[in-house]
A protein has these predicted regions:
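Glycine- and aromatic-rich loop/turn segments at beta-sheet edges
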Residues: 54-67, 108-115, 119-123, 180-198, ...
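Aromatic- and acidic-residue-enriched carbohydrate-binding clefts of CAZyme catalytic domains
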Residues: 122-133, 201-207
Length: 408
């Protein structure tokens, strides 16, 4: 291409991008933090459009420079790209999701080797789907339901037979593994999750039972997979229904605080359990409220995390995760406060990049999480009756928007 052609193509592309997408206007807000939030929102859209919208999932640092040996991490694709269908760019996520079909044989072999049906999506990988060796990554499971969630977001943006035909088979294969991975506890008459390292990676695979975020995600994704069966004209899987009905509720302590996992009885006494990701908050926020959770206990947990967490040992997406939890629990002051909390890993540089430390000078999951959180804070979720549920209703946050879609 000649320079003039490139300039013309770029001009037309960006005009189309901004005209198609949703928009959020903070100019009527009087809270002094609003301009900074608007800056982060606008720059994040641009940064993610150029670095997290390709034919393969993006690495944490996108195309800026290599991180983790240039590998991308499938548990991060939700953070990079879940915002896209919510902001009018389902086509960008759709483009990336096609990669899953190309690596299906690898994922099927991983599941087969471990004695499971269906497909087990890898954690740290590359365009070929090769599973990178790791004493942590191979035990993670929260990347598994992402495909179901992301396919659901694409469908909600374009509810059509075409989308069902395109993704239903892999939705079902993903759920087959999830059902088989859960263990039925005959003594207590319940299904449990074990043998995994949860999103909060300070826990150990050998001892962890029923991590809360993963339990909630299993519940949501299996319900969603059943919906896809019905949309495709298939009968519900009765075994899956039994698991959905009998999944273990989240474990809590005598103070009615949810534990990092059922076995982690010292969650609030041992800093190992109160560092890294506060994944328990993802159980409601990233995901809708469900029958495994009591909202009053989850509010207790949010308040404890807010006041006591080891915030110096967090990551960029922990702040939007906290904001989404606060939004769904009816605490908009905390939602805004989380997005703008003055912590090193919640720093957004002049260019919009989410700075973590000298090694990770940009961290795109933080940017993507920010946009997903703002969508939830504005457009809410299925059944939400509150306007702008994530912003205080005291008149200082007169947020106006168009084109955003609610979350599940």
């Amino acid at each position: 291409y000649k320079r003039q052609e490139v300039e013309s193509l770029a001009k037309n592309h960006w005009a189309s991008f901004w005209e198609k997408c949703a928009a959020v206007d903070f100019s009527h807000c009087t809270d002094p933090r609003a301009p900074e939030l608007e800056r982060r929102v606008l720059l994040s859209q641009y940064l993610l459009a150029i670095q997290s919208a390709g034919s393969v999932p993006p690495q944490e640092t996108g195309l800026t420079y290599n991180s983790w040996f240039g590998k991308f991490h499938l548990e991060m694709i939700w953070w990079h790209q879940a915002w896209q269908p919510l902001w009018g760019h389902a086509n960008l996520l759709d483009r990336t999701l096609g990669w899953y079909e190309t690596v299906e044989p690898v994922a099927r072999e991983i599941a087969r080797r471990q004695g499971f049906p269906g497909v087990r999506w890898m954690k740290m990988t590359d365009p070929s789907g090769t599973e990178a060796p790791s004493n942590v990554g191979s035990f993670l499971i929260w990347q598994q339901p992402h495909f179901i969630y992301l396919a659901e977001l694409v469908y909600r943006a374009n509810p059509s037979d075409e989308v069902i035909k395109k993704y239903n088979r892999l939705v079902q294969e993903t759920a087959e593994f999830m059902y088989a991975f859960a263990t039925y506890d005959e003594f207590h008459g319940r299904f449990i999750l074990k043998g995994a390292i949860p999103a909060q990676e300070t826990l150990r695979a050998a001892t962890t039972i029923n991590p809360p975020f993963e339990l909630s995600y299993w519940h949501f994704a299996m319900q969603t997979a059943q919906k896809w069966r019905e949309r495709a004209g298939e009968k519900r899987n009765l075994e899956w229904d039994e698991m959905i009905d009998k999944l273990s509720p989240l474990a809590y302590n005598e103070d009615h605080l949810y534990l990092a996992s059922e076995d982690a009885v010292d969650t609030y006494k041992d800093i190992r359990f109160t560092s890294d990701h506060m994944a328990v908050l993802g159980s409601v926020g990233i995901l809708p409220m469900n029958k495994l959770i009591r909202d009053d206990y989850m509010k207790n947990t949010l308040h404890w995390v807010w006041d006591n967490w080891n915030w110096g040992k967090t990551w960029g997406w922990d702040y939007p995760m906290t904001a989404m939890n606060a939004t769904r629990l009816g605490e908009p002051e905390k939602a805004v406060g989380a997005l703008l909390m003055d912590k090193r890993t919640n720093t957004y540089l002049q260019n919009g990049h989410n700075y973590q430390d000298g090694r990770l000078r940009c961290y795109l999951p933080g940017n993507g999480g920010l946009l997903t959180a703002v969508a939830l804070m504005c457009a809410g979720w299925d059944g939400c009756q509150v306007k702008n549920p994530g912003f205080p209703q005291d008149g200082t946050w007169d947020v106006r928007w168009e084109g955003l879609k609610p979350m599940p």
